[in-house]
Each structure stands twice: as structure tokens, then as C-alpha cells.
Amino acid sequence: MRTIIIRSFFLLAVCLAQAQSADPKPLVEKAIQAVGGKDKLLKIYRLKEVFHFGETPEPAAGKKRSLRDSILSQPDMWWINKKERGPDPAKDDARAWSLDLLVDEKSRFEIIPDIVDEGRKCVGLKITGSVTPAMSLYLDQETLLLRRLDWRSDFYRFSEWKEYDGLRYASRTVIFKTKSGKPWFFHDITELERLAQLPAGLDHPKASK
């Protein structure tokens, strides 16, 4: 029995070492190509969204989904109803969802062990340098589309893939608490629009002195 345990730990150590030593660049490039290529990634864009908080796909009795109109400019600006939301981890979530982190020169990548998420085999990619704390992205092994993000105390599942202007994007995100595994936020994108420039009338935070 002791020999079996030792062998198991040895195999695990070997797998971890192989994952950490693998070159992540091909996986990063394939993930970008899977959604349409670098030129199709979003930089300035508008989202129309519907969302609610709770543990069920439908809002609790007496509650309704919230509507939101957002404008984002990667990497760090996000306006809701023309007001910039300021420092917020959600900006990094959006950069992961849009794969903007994969083209950030500050990003450092590392292959991490594969997982199985809801029956789907996923390959893992850890991102540091451009985001704190580190993010773990999991790409569907067959499609190489982003399926799951593990970050901070949550994990995110992305689904309902759609296509717009040559770009494939996940229109649905469900966020779960890592500790309990229970969902707490449901989000759907109802409209996506690529913008050539920021529209007029947006609030611009004053630079700190």
C-alpha cells in the first residue's frame, strides 16, 4: 500500500513538472485563433447586458433581472451609464473573457495541469504579470474556447458561444463560489458592438495628483 502511495505522488510530481516546463506559447496562439484571431479581439466595445444575483438560473420570486449598458476600453476603462466604475476586479474578469490578457505584453504564461469540468476535458493556462492575483484559465480541449476561469475566491463558467464580426464570444457567464461550488451571479450579453472610438459624453476620472 505504501509503495502505491509513493508511486502516485511520484507520478503527480512528474505531471506537474511536465506541465510547468511545457511551452505555453502555442496554446496561447491557438486560443486566440479559436475566437477569430488577434485582429478580431475587442478593444473598445459596447455591451448590453442582463444579469441577476442568486443561486438559480432564474431570479428569486418577486425579483427581476437587471439591465445594463456598458462601454469598455481595454485594458482598464469601463463605463456604466456613462460613469467610469473606477478600480474594480471586474475589469480583469472582462479582460480574461475577451482574451485581452493573452495579448498583453506584461502577461506571463504557464501551462498548468488539465482538469475535467462538467465532463469536458480542459487544458490549463496560468497568467501572471498583467493581473494580480494570478488567474487560471481552462480551455476546452476540443475547441480551445475559454470554458472556465479560476480567480480569487470564485470560478467562472463561460457558455452560449455566439459570433459577431468574425469574433466568437461567450454570451453567458455564471460565477460560482469556489469554497461551496454554488453559483451566485448569472450574466448574459444580449448585444455586442465593436466601436472605432469612445463615444462623446463619457465621464473621465480626474488623474490623481
Regions flagged by a language model, labelled:
Residues 45-47, 100-113, 152-156:
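A short, amphipathic edge element
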Residues 10-19:
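Hydrophobic h-region of N-terminal signal peptides that target proteins for export
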Residues 56-100:
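An acidic-aromatic
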Residues 26, 46, 71-72, 79, ...:
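N- and C-terminal low-complexity/disordered segments
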Residues 121-207:
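Gly/Pro-enriched, hydrophobic low-complexity segments
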Residues 2-11:
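Sec-dependent signal peptide recognition
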Residues 19-56:
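N-terminal leader/targeting segments and the immediate start of mature chains
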Residues 114-119:
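Hydrophobic, aromatic-enriched alpha-helical segments typical of multi-pass transmembrane helices
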